[in-house]
Amino acid sequence: MKTLFFATTNENKINEVKNILDIPNLNLIVPQNFNIKETGKTFKENSLLKAKALFEILNNNQNVFGEDSGLCIEALNLEPGIYSKRYDTYKLCKKLSTNEKNQLILDLMKNEKNRKAYFICNISYISKNGQILNFEGIIKGKIALSLNDKKNYGFGYDSIFLTKNNKKLSDLTLEEKNKISHRGIAFLKFKKFLLKSLFNS
């Protein structure tokens, strides 16, 4: 049994990652009360920040990884970007619900013809011997004109992001989403690496 620590407390991310990293004899552990300020200026810096913090907490001798991801919109100068999770407080200095955050984006995009956007996911892995590796995934699409008004899957900005097939990410099941999403792409690369490095397969 191999052990791998994930530097997050985001339940939605945990569920997606567990679905992708479905490797026999891999024990994926998520720390409790893990809270690190994301002070990096890029997704890569933030994912490494989380991984390094957890690596130190675990006395520098466990395999760990951190992940940072977000939505980048061309017409908004690639915002919300690294502020995706906290775009409400960054933009309005107050907390909003997920639907309200999505509506904020739609309001900002109201008169924009260019609706191109992409989701990006960056993974930073630190092996127990201190080796650092990085994995990245991107899905390109566009911002929808309205919110989903039906019961849907997904979380965050999934309900306003249209894929190239003109489907919202929130219309896809977890399995369908993981086949094409930024997180799915990045973690599939990571999974291949883990199978080779930890399990020699």
Swiss-Prot record:
It comes from the Bacteria. The active site is at D68. It is an enzyme of class 3 (hydrolase). Keywords: Hydrolase, Magnesium, Metal-binding, Nucleotide metabolism, Nucleotide-binding. The keyword Transmembrane does not apply. One of its GO terms (biological process) is nucleotide metabolic process. One of its GO terms (molecular function) is metal ion binding. Substrate binds at T8, T9, N10, E11, N12, K13, S69, F155, G156, Y157, D158, K177, H182, R183. Homodimer. Pyrophosphatase that catalyzes the hydrolysis of nucleoside triphosphates to their monophosphate derivatives, with a high preference for the non-canonical purine nucleotides XTP (xanthosine triphosphate), dITP (deoxyinosine triphosphate) and ITP. Seems to function as a house-cleaning enzyme that removes non-canonical purine nucleotides from the nucleotide pool, thus preventing their incorporation into DNA/RNA and avoiding chromosomal lesions. This is dITP/XTP pyrophosphatase. It comes from Borreliella burgdorferi (strain ATCC 35210 / DSM 4680 / CIP 102532 / B31). The lineage of its organism: Bacteria, Pseudomonadati, Spirochaetota, Spirochaetia, Spirochaetales.
